[in-house]
Amino acid sequence: TSIDRSAKVTLMEDGVLIAPAPYTSASAYYFPTSGRINSVEVLKGPSSISAGPSTIGGAINLISTPIPEMTSGKLVQEFGENGMIRTHANYGVNSGDFGALIEIHDHSSDGFASIANVGGDTGFDKSDLMLKARYESGNHSLAFKYLDLDETSEQSYVGLSQVSFNINPHRRYGMTQYDEMQNDG
C-alpha cells in the first residue's frame, strides 16, 4: 500500500473533515473509534465534490451516535483475551426543542505481541468522551458537538523480516520497546 494512506479519499465524521490539513496533507492518521459510529455514508463520483478536496476516490462520512428521539441509554461491557476490556455507554435526552447525548467509549488491552529479549507492554488504552446538544426553533436549529480522545499505544512502525516472521509472527524486535504513540485530544 502507498504511504499516503487515505490521500485520495476524503474522510469525514458527521460531515466535518477528519484530516488536519486536507489541502496539503490529506492522509489521515486519526480515524474515529468504530464503536462510536452509527452509520457510514459513501459518496462516489460527482456527489463527492461537495465533500471537499481529495475526492478522486470518493468521500466517506462516518456518522456518530445520534441524539435519541426519546430519553434512553445503553451500556455494553466486554472482556476478552490479553486483558481486553471495552466499555461503551451513552445516555441521551430529548424534550421538544432540545436534545442532548453523552457517550463514553473506553477500550484497553495488554497486547498480544512479545518484545524479544526485554519483554514489555504491547497493548493500548483508548478513551473517547463525546457530548452532543441540539436546539431547534421553527425552521432553524443549532447543533454542538464536543469530542475528547486520549490514546496511548505501545505500538511500533517497525516490522519483521520474513525469517523473524516465520519463527514467530507475534514477536517484536527488542529495539522497539520504547516505541509509544500518545494522542491527547
Task: Please place each PLM-identified region on the residue numbering.
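Flexible, solvent-exposed coil segments and beta strand-coil junctions
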Residues: 64-72, 105-114, 124, 165-175
